[in-house]
Amino acid sequence: MCGIVGAIAQRDVAEILLEGLRRLEYRGYDSAGLAVVDAEGHMTRLRRLGKVQMLAQAAEEHPLHGGTGIAHTRWATHGEPSEVNAHPHVSEHIVVVHNGIIENHEPLREELKARGYTFVSETDTEVIAHLVNWELKQGGTLREAVLRAIPQLRGAYGTVIMDSRHPDTLLAARSGSPLVIGLGMGENFIASDQLALLPVTRRFIFLEEGDIAEITRRSVNIFDKTGAEVKRQDIESNLQYDAGDKGIYRHYMQKEIYEQPNAIKNTLTGRISHGQVDLSELGPNADELLSKVEHIQILACGTSYNSGMVSRYWFESLAGIPCDVEIASEFRYRKSAVRRNSLMITLSQSGETADTLAGLRLSKELGYLGSLAICNVPGSSLVRESDLALMTNAGTEIGVASTKAFTTQLTVLLMLVAKLSRLKGLDASIEHDIVHGLQALPSRIEQMLSQDKRIEALAEDFSDKHHALFLGRGDQYPIALEGALKLKEISYIHAEAYAAGELKHGPLALIDADMPVIVVAPNNELLEKLKSNIEEVRARGGQLYVFADQDAGFVSSDNMHIIEMPHVEEVIAPIFYTVPLQLLAYHVALIKGTDVDQPRNLAKSVTVE
């Protein structure tokens, strides 16, 4: 969601801040701003509604000089998107940027008004600026003021604070929203995502929950909320910002759809050996833990939740392990009964999804056997806090609507299923079929991508529609969910997905000539049942678009469009059938002229509740 970048150096830092913000644009935002302080304490602040490029243009018109600065991209939570609500916020000489939500901002606002403070924005962040200012007036250093102010905040925050009168220091505090310090030579940096700092450093310290950091050019000191100094290990990162430019593609999403064959190859690299899945990266004790697993609980949000839903079918049918999948925001606020020897699996592209992280932390209190994170970002909070972790190795995903992160999550999950089936002593043919299918998957997707022009032609039929219905059965039902999510995310068409067997239990009432119905139809044991559901739609005049196996025996008619798909191995069919639905959503959005890579109101990494 929001992005933070801070720098303290002997050189001008404005361009470092702007480049950091550019690297965080993919997370989603509606406004941007920065503040820079020079050695004499002169502070310059610029804020703009819209893209970082508009802020950069303003910085060219009003050159910013100074070695200390903080910058921010805002995704509105409290207060509409506007320049006055954009960060940084100030209270006299105190300057603040903040990610998260301060839940008790209203009573704090009233207290501060009673003390004479005037609020100029609608944001909860301005409360932090005035509160630190008030505490500083009570005496002591900026660090002491921050240590007194922070315990008064309830909610999630990652915040960076500077005092323009003392430009030699930055203060940062983290609770529920990530912050990482970048270590340089005679200069230091801070950001909400290490990607922002890769041009200036490879050495990082990840702040932990409750940490408060004091950063100067030559030192970093970290304290807990009591003011006691704590030690945090610095690491050398090999993370690559490999998004590059869009090349021949119009959008990052299109590029990332086409990158999926190579992304899946990268996910598989080093993990298949002698016809078996090799997950030795999990460490020497992983087999002992995994062999005890009698139940799997999966937590995720959004697209990751849909991948978890697919894997439930795999864990149960192929590994014989009962599996439950739950939306993380629901799990964390209900009283749940923990099954015996239950493994907690969390799924997140970013590894910073607030609800998923909170669910992981809750699982440790509830007594789960262990935790395993499946993630695309090494060093993320989810990875650091889990017992075991598997990286998807999808490469940087810029488009807000997930594509290659989803299919590589499924690839990792299927490898884990193979591993567990072997540990459970099941028939070796299960793992053999999974490995064979996964090795064939990249070429199968390349075949499918050759159908792009056919799908593009169909997209015209959707451009004037307001609703769409997706249907699937078995492990294709979650793929229908994912297809509906993609269409609504980027084309703004209201789309719903149902298990096809539920058609008569409500959704059939929606069917008419203006309701496109998209069906995924691999040639499996559920095909005949699915054909009956399709006939129910045809009989009521619905417009059908069926992505069907070439051997499934479908014939196009006036109200049924058949898009033939190459035959694929059954075990990989859910991954394969995801791709045409991604392309359909992309082309519909293109016709409608929406912002494909950064759809309205959405963020790539949801770091608040």
Swiss-Prot record:
Subcellular location: Cytoplasm
Official protein name in the record: Glutamine--fructose-6-phosphate aminotransferase [isomerizing]
SIS domain segment(s): 286-426, 458-599
Catalytic-site annotation from UniProt: C2, K604
Residues annotated as domain Glutamine amidotransferase type-2: 2-218
InterPro entries named in the record: GATase_2_dom, GFAT, GFAT_N, GlmS/AgaS_SIS, GlmS/FrlB_SIS, Ntn_hydrolases_N, SIS_dom, SIS_dom_sf
Main location: cytoplasm
UniProt KW keywords: Aminotransferase, Cytoplasm, Glutamine amidotransferase, Repeat, Transferase
Subunit structure: Homodimer. In pull-down experiments interacts with CedA.
Induction details: Post-transcriptionally regulated by the GlmY/GlmZ sRNA regulatory cascade. The sRNA GlmZ, together with Hfq, directly activates glmS mRNA translation through base-pairing. A second sRNA, GlmY, positively regulates glmS indirectly, by sequestering the adapter protein RapZ and protecting GlmZ from RNA cleavage.
Catalytic activity: D-fructose 6-phosphate + L-glutamine = D-glucosamine 6-phosphate + L-glutamate
A cellular component annotation (GO) from this entry: cytosol
Tree of life domain: Bacteria
EC number(s) reported in the record: 2.6.1.16
UniProt entry tagged with the keyword Transferase: yes
